[in-house]
Amino acid sequence: MTEIQKPYDLKGRSLLKESDFTKAEFEGLIDFAITLKEYKKNGIKHHYLSGKNIALLFEKNSTRTRAAFTVASIDLGAHPEFLGKNDIQLGKKESVEDTAKVLGRMFDGIEFRGFSQQAVEDLAKFSGVPVWNGLTDDWHPTQMLADFMTIKENFGYLEGINLTYVGDGRNNIAHSLMVAGAMLGVNVRICTPKSLNPKEAYVDIAKEKASQYGGSVMITDNIAEAVENTDAIYTDVWVSMGEESEFEQRINLLKDYQVNQQMFDLTGKDSTIFLHCLPAFHDTNTLYGQEIYEKYGLAEMEVTDQIFRSEHSKVFDQAENRMHTIKAVMAATLGS
């Protein structure tokens, strides 16, 4: 029988943004997640968090994040408690500080998915327990662990990988890919119209990490330059939650940046993989997709159905890996 290893040790730490961790710590979490994935595949129990209680705070809805934290908690022997936007009063009827102090006395760890980065920072500051950022408008660190785990599973390494993000350069995925990638020695290319370039503050953090750890950061609106010899092409939705009024403007800006076969041909290699944090608008098989088609005549948006369903696509491995990497973070910061 396989011997259960002790959890990777980051006891008491919070994961609020990628730069909270060193390269070695981030890689350690990825490797630990790969081990936990094998445990689950082989039916090996790994109850590192028996008796623990986990609060799952959701201001923003999510399929993958909620499912991943819930299953990860149960697999680790913990009890997850979901608190949706109608259950919590962060900054409305009760301050984040007061909420944090209450939850910290009842729960052993807190996940937060919402809008404000300051909110998740304050939860960590005042709760006295580990807090994990499930997504804010600024950063998406748990997604990054899954993304780079997926890349490592496909190529066997991270340092020196070329990763191209195509789309809105101002969103949290672009921010996090730049910083996490640079920290892991990855060459990150953000391909976006100039008007959607990431803010300099985020680029500066990424470039600092690149100089420290050996990665690189490129910001360009030239698609051919961005995807040449790239190992992975990553995209995200063109319009995020709360931005629905900007659909027409965003479509006009990004229609030439759709991930399609022509873009993959420009890579010059057959081994390039496709990544997407999901949900993806690649067909009209949703009410949302039908509405976009009726309004704008687009049956596909950020990625074509051909690429989404192709052998290049690793999006469902990536989605599964949310659970394994979140499990690694929880076990590392709470386990003993």
UniProtKB/Swiss-Prot annotation:
GO terms of molecular function = amino acid binding; ornithine carbamoyltransferase activity
Which amino acid positions bind L-ornithine, per UniProt? 172, 236, 240-241
- Annotated pathway, please? Amino-acid degradation; L-arginine degradation via ADI pathway; carbamoyl phosphate from L-arginine: step 2/2
Query: Which subcellular locations apply to this protein?
Result: Cytoplasm
EC number(s) in its UniProt entry? 2.1.3.3
Xref: InterPro entries: Asp/Orn_carbamoyltranf_P-bd, Asp/Orn_carbamoylTrfase, Asp/Orn_carbamoylTrfase_sf, Asp_carbamoyltransf_Asp/Orn-bd, Orn/put_carbamltrans, OTCase_ArgI
Reaction equation(s) it catalyzes: carbamoyl phosphate + L-ornithine = L-citrulline + phosphate + H(+)
Give the GO biological process terms: arginine biosynthetic process via ornithine; arginine catabolic process to ornithine; citrulline biosynthetic process; L-arginine biosynthetic process
Q: Name one Pfam family in it.
A: OTCace_N
Protein residues bound to carbamoyl phosphate? 62-65, 89, 113, 140-143, 277-278, 322
One GO cellular component this record assigns the protein to is: cytoplasm
Keywords from UniProt, A to Z, are: Arginine metabolism, Cytoplasm, Transferase
| Family to which the UniProt record says this protein belongs | Belongs to the aspartate/ornithine carbamoyltransferase superfamily. OTCase family.
Q: What does this protein do?
A: Reversibly catalyzes the transfer of the carbamoyl group from carbamoyl phosphate (CP) to the N(epsilon) atom of ornithine (ORN) to produce L-citrulline.
Protein name in the entry: Ornithine carbamoyltransferase, catabolic
Q: Which gene encodes it?
A: arcB
